[in-house]
């Protein structure tokens, strides 16, 4: 009886204490929220236009508006940002937490937040976190209440972790994977990320346009759903922040977009930003490695991994982590490899993103890019002064010449450990080519404009590890800009929505091998004829696209994964079998095969993998392809010869990305499939007559 009483008193006291603590926290964060004031104007498409007197006010409003439309993906990110995937997914999630903790991401943020993050940026980040917390207070029954309160460190961690995927640590691991049977904990974080399928940014100036305008189409390809899907918003303050464009859940800054003076977009590039070093271990002491002739102690730490075992039962596992002077150490097949990669201790990405958001000229934007905390991406820029620019942004290590850095490096010599980046002026960039056009589509940085304006690759060190791949989108861009001697608004959009494959592309060359093959069945001979007559388009009425895209997809997926594709004959036979089983024939209309699904409805859509109208589909339960990545939010911005701006955009779904009860859940789908745009209502006068709702937060 006494034990029961003690248990009851303990539980009662604990519950009372928790409730008291929760109320104190709520009161504290409500008081914090009341220090901000933001005006949210929803346009007729539901897109939020946020205004605040200060940048911090605007960031607070942005966080609240985004949470209204998509709190789920913002909150889901916090499992990863806090290295708590183990508490969500058990052992598989703990493996992801291990890598984040080995890389000391949260540790560095907590240690260096006040010194590394600029004060004006801290104010914005802290206001953004306060906006999320205010939404959570207003919606206390949400299923992610365990993340309350969100902190500024959570926000910075998101930027650092995203930088991780592009920094090269995963490339280092992939290099080792080709040599050894690598442990799961070193690859699971990479394999659990959505595939980023590429991007397009096209820019033209008065040297190419028929009306002396300057134009840019920003067309980043992301997953259409999830934590890396685009959200459209407009942020404006009286402190000079006036950006509209795309951002990810949990971001207070626009990643791709425009203001009244400039616009930019990014595409993924793949410079070699990482290295793996093979260490020599002391045979008498496994905790020492050889460096410059001397045995050197590893730095050793214990990593704690809280993990869900079953239901509410949790357990904290402990793992050892080793570090050399090169970086974190992986033990693989009785060998020790140290990793070194660009940005490995940098948490300043937020400073650079904010500087870009506040830029208003070419020089200001370039100054932001010179910060080098964003370690990769191709940047394409345009402005009202008729400037266009291509930048192969790369925080490339300053490496010793004469060494093949694609291979594993000798870890016993300290002179092979690089400690700085090549100068900004030494990375590829083109400003105002005489051709008047730039097309960045994840390709060779020396083939982004007319041949007479392209850079000479021989002027760049091989230690930069610059990519040489060409995409179909790159070939088609070059062909189309060559075909159209002058470009106007409609022609520029025609190029953007082109849905054909080039005969120069890897995809076509892969398929063409099938043309000369001999088959012994009527079914395969008929399918071969269908493939031969394909005009390489992916328009809705095309009857060869289903077979063609099916076959070439194997090559494209293999290239993305840096694998050798299977024999095209095997792909061909597999596709004939798949299409026949699904449609009863190998030549269904592309409109019967390729869809975008939303709100229980499927709508046919043109485009396909690696065409400029990029649609990356996944098979659904019926065997059809449903768009999962590619064209999402895209934006067309222009300035006429007088500097007057026009802008239009479209989102694959609508602004209310998670609210199925809202008309804005899917109200842009039809425009999307019709390859049309909506106005952005960026100008105050346009927004004033196209407003659906105005409200203030806090109320």
What positions do the PLM features span?
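A structural micro-motif at secondary-structure boundaries
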Residues: 526-533
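C-terminal/peripheral segments of proteins
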Residues: 20-509, 513, 517-520, 533-699
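C-terminal motif of bacterial Sec signal peptides marking the signal peptidase cleavage site
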Residues: 16-17
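Sec-dependent signal peptide recognition
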Residues: 2-9
């Amino acid at each position: 009886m006494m034990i029961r009483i003690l248990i009851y008193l303990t539980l009662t006291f604990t519950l009372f204490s928790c409730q008291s603590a929760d109320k104190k926290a709520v009161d504290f964060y409500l008081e914090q929220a009341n220090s901000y004031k933001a005006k949210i104007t929803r346009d007729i498409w539901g897109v939020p236009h946020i205004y605040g007197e200060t940048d911090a006010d605007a960031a607070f409003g942005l966080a609240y508006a985004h949470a209204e439309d998509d709190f789920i993906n913002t909150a889901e990110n916090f499992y990863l940002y806090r290295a708590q995937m183990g508490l969500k997914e058990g052992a598989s999630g703990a493996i992801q937490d291990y890598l984040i903790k080995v890389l000391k991401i949260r540790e560095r943020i907590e240690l260096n937040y006040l010194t590394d993050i600029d004060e004006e940026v801290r104010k914005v980040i802290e206001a953004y976190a306060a906006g999320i917390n205010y939404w959570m207070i207003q919606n206390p029954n949400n299923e992610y209440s365990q993340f309350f309160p969100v902190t500024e460190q959570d926000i910075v961690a998101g930027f650092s972790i995203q930088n991780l995927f592009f920094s090269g640590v995963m490339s280092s691991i992939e290099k080792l994977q080709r040599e050894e049977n690598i442990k799961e904990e070193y690859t699971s974080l990479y394999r659990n990320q959505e595939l980023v399928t590429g991007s397009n940014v096209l820019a033209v100036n008065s040297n190419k346009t028929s009306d002396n305008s300057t134009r840019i189409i920003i067309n980043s390809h992301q997953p259409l759903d999830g934590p890396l899907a685009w959200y459209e918003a407009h942020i404006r303050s009286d402190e000079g922040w006036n950006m509209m464009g795309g951002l990810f859940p949990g971001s207070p800054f626009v990643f791709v977009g425009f203001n009244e003076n400039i616009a930019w977009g990014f595409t993924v590039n793949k410079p070699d930003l990482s290295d793996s070093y093979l260490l020599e271990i002391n045979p008498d002491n496994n905790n020492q490695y050889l460096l410059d002739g001397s045995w050197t102690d590893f730095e050793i730490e214990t990593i704690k991994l809280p993990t869900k075992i079953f239901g509410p039962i949790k357990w904290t596992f402990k793992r050892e982590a080793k570090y050399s002077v090169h970086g974190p150490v992986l033990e693989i097949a009785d060998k020790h490899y140290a990793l070194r990669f660009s940005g490995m201790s940098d948490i300043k990405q937020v400073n650079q993103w904010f500087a870009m958001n506040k830029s208003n000229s070419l020089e200001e934007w370039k100054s932001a890019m010179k910060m080098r905390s964003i370690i990769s991406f191709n940047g394409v820029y345009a402005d009202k002064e008729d400037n266009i620019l291509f930048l192969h942004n790369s925080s490339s290590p300053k490496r010793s010449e004469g060494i093949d850095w694609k291979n594993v490096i000798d870890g016993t010599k300290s002179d092979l450990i690089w400690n700085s980046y090549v100068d900004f002026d030494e990375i590829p960039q083109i400003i105002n080519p005489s051709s008047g056009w730039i097309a960045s589509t994840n390709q060779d940085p020396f083939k982004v404009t007319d041949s007479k304006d392209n850079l000479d690759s021989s002027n760049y060190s091989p230690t930069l590890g610059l990519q040489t791949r060409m995409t179909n989108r790159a070939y088609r861009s070059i062909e189309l800009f060559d075909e159209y001697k002058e470009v106007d608004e409609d022609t520029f959009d025609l190029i953007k929505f082109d849905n054909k494959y080039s005969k120069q592309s890897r995809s076509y060359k892969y398929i063409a091998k099938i043309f000369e093959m001999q088959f012994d069945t009527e079914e395969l001979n008929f399918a071969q004829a269908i493939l031969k007559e394909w005009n390489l388009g992916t328009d809705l009425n095309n009857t060869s696209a289903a077979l063609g895209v099916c076959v070439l997809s194997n090559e494209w997926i293999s290239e993305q994964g840096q694998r050798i594709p299977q024999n095209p004959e095997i792909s061909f036979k597999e596709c004939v079998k798949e299409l026949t089983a699904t449609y009863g024939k190998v030549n269904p209309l592309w409109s019967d095969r390729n869809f975008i699904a939303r709100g229980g409805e499927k709508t046919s859509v043109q485009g396909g993998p690696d065409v400029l109208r990029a649609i990356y589909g996944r098979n659904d339960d019926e065997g059809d392809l449903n768009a999962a990545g590619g064209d999402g939010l895209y934006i067309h911005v222009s300035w006429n010869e007088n500097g007057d701006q026009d802008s239009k955009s479209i989102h694959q779904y609508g602004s209310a990305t998670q609210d199925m009860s809202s008309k804005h859940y899917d109200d842009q789908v039809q425009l999307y499939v019709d390859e049309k745009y909506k106005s952005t209502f960026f100008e105050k006068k346009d927004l004033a007559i196209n407003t659906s709702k105005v409200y203030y937060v806090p109320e």
